Regions:
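Bacterial N-terminal signal peptides
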Residues: 2-13
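N-terminal hydrophobic targeting/anchoring segments and the immediately downstream early-domain regions
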Residues: 17-112, 315-316, 358
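Active-site-proximal loop/turn and secondary-structure-junction residues that shape catalytic pockets
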Residues: 38, 65, 102-106, 158-159, ...
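Second-shell residues forming the walls of enzyme active-site clefts
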Residues: 42-46, 50, 59, 71-91, ...
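Surface-exposed loop and adjacent secondary-structure segments within mature catalytic domains
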Residues: 106, 112, 121-122, 139-226
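Transmembrane beta-barrel architecture of outer-membrane proteins
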Residues: 117-125, 253
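Alpha-helical scaffold segments that flank or form the walls of functional sites
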Residues: 129-150, 306-309
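Mid-to-C-terminal alpha-helical segments outside catalytic/metal-binding sites
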Residues: 339-363
Length: 363
């Protein structure tokens, strides 16, 4: 897989001679993934500015603009997306992570209405329980991403379908099964298909969102009374198999793991459980830091500090629940201040930078 990625979707301006050690600001820039408006970019686009000036590490594409309440935010046709992604990647000094939520079924940013191939939901694949079928559909999905130049799929969902009335998981057909073994098998098939096409994947939503009764996009979500350790099994098995490229945290509150903070801000959950107990040393990506589960309870600076202390490597600001063209310089300023004042060590920043470089196949 490594060779494919180096010459494929993450290829960029790789210098012939080893580059000098990056400046702190450049390392911090790699720890951010940001959304933006527009189906095309130019010299005046803030996202191009941040890729060039601030060494922004990743972007995330959306088909629908939540704030404006209209479609066509970044995606209108295959030709348009391919051109957009090429322009974004061309601006990057370090290969850019271009990400999208293309799970399949209801959660697919590249839709048939815009000329993309149809996709199949996790729930349908799990219900059929045919690994060859899952592999076939996943390969077709990954081929679409590859053709667009999109190198990171924010999928598969490995939440268990434990609550059939879950408004954000089961009700949207986003989970393979309530059985962790079925989830694991199909997730591994899904991942293998992506790797065949040089596309990275993201397990989500750690440590488990399947039992929730509420949507963390909208506010506080507590799974303390419904979560079980069975929800960790897919993560444990996929990590053990060496197939976990990146893992996305959930903004769920679980007092059995941390009595004070939701998973994204919880050192006990990420550093303790995910890295310590489950042995994951890859990239941890936050769910969108602009979701109400975070913004309604924590200030911008506190949320960033707690996420970094918890072990998050890439902070996602989708810019789709609220829109801020200065989000990258604002976040960099906060993190630099945390380092300058000794709250966060530069060694901690280096940890994330090294993981991100490994993910991009540069270390």
């Amino acid at each position: 897989m490594g060779g494919i990625l180096l010459t494929g979707l993450l290829a960029g301006s790789v210098m012939a001679a080893p580059p000098p050690p990056p400046a702190l600001k450049d390392k911090i820039g790699q720890m951010l993934m940001v959304g933006f408006r527009g189906t095309a970019v130019d010299e005046n686009s803030f996202i191009i500015r941040d890729i060039r000036r601030n060494n922004l590490g990743g972007v995330v594409l959306f088909d629908y603009d939540v704030v404006k309440g209209q479609a066509g935010r970044n995606i209108t046709s295959p030709a348009q997306v391919k051109a957009l992604v090429a322009a974004l990647r061309e601006a990057a000094r370090v290969p850019l992570l271009v990400a999208v939520d293309q799970e399949g079924g209801k959660v697919a940013r590249l839709k048939t209405a815009c000329g993309f191939p149809a996709t199949v939901s996790h729930s349908t694949l799990g219900r059929l329980d045919d690994l060859a079928n899952t592999g076939q559909h996943s390969l077709r999905l990954a081929e679409t991403l590859n053709a667009m130049g999109i190198g990171l799929n924010l999928a598969p969902v490995v939440d268990l379908c434990t609550n059939p009335d879950n408004p954000v998981i089961a009700k949207l057909d986003r989970c393979f099964s309530a059985d962790p073994k079925i989830v694991t098998r199909h997730a591994l098939s899904y991942i293998a298909a992506h790797h065949q096409r040089g596309v990275l994947t993201t397990l989500k939503h750690f440590p488990g969102h399947g039992s929730s009764r509420a949507d963390s996009h909208l506010g506080f979500t507590d799974v303390s009374d419904t979560w079980t350790r069975d929800e960790l099994e897919p993560y444990a098995r996929i990590i053990e198999a060496g197939q976990a490229d990146a893992i996305m945290t959930a903004h769920v509150f679980n007092t059995r793991l941390d009595k004070l903070y939701p998973a994204t801000l919880s050192s006990a959950t990420i550093n303790g459980l995910l890295r310590g107990e489950l042995g994951f040393d890859g990239v941890v990506i936050s769910d969108d830091m602009q979701m109400a589960a975070i913004t309604a309870h924590y200030g911008f600076e506190i949320a960033i500090r707690k996420a970094l202390e918890a072990g998050v490597d890439i902070l996602v600001f989708g810019n789709n629940l609220r829109y801020d063209e200065e989000i990258v310089p604002r976040a960099i300023a906060v993190i630099r201040k945390l380092v300058d004042t000794g709250v966060i060590s530069e060694a901690r920043i280096d940890q994330s930078w090294q993981r991100i470089m490994r993910l991009k196949n540069l270390k």
